[in-house]
A protein has these predicted regions:
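Hydrophobic helix-and-loop "lid/oligomerization" segment in the mid-to-C-terminal part
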Residues: 1-75, 80-111
Length: 111
């Protein structure tokens, strides 16, 4: 499952963005591990994995320190730490990804 998540990733402004299709028992753990591993992709400063759980879209965010994912996730109603953060959105996967891309754009514009 983790490999499938990583394989779905695309790079946007030095961020790896991936999504988990469907739901499975350990989706939260798989998403977190995938976000960690995606930081190993050359040129990536942050990673984000979107997955559905409990009727919401969750985003697990990781950073190597160059991008403050806490600030990005806080702008979307979440929180966390400089290198590890998350948020939950009451929307669908497509809209969540659009919101994430807007939040990344805003972060880069302001930092």
């Amino acid at each position: 499952q983790k490999a499938a998540i990583i394989n779905s990733s695309e790079i946007y402004r030095k961020c790896a963005i991936a999504h988990a299709d469907g739901t499975f028992s350990n989706i939260r753990v798989a998403a977190s591990k995938a976000a960690d591993e995606m930081l190993e992709i050359s040129g990536v400063n942050a990673s984000f994995v979107l997955y559905e759980l409990g009727g919401q879209v969750n985003i697990s965010a990781r950073s190597l320190g160059r991008y403050n994912v806490q600030v990005i996730m806080e702008s979307m109603g979440g929180g966390g730490h400089h290198e590890m953060a998350a948020c939950q959105l009451n929307t669908d996967m497509d809209d969540a990804k659009k919101q994430l891309i807007s939040a990344i754009d805003e972060y880069i514009r302001n930092n």
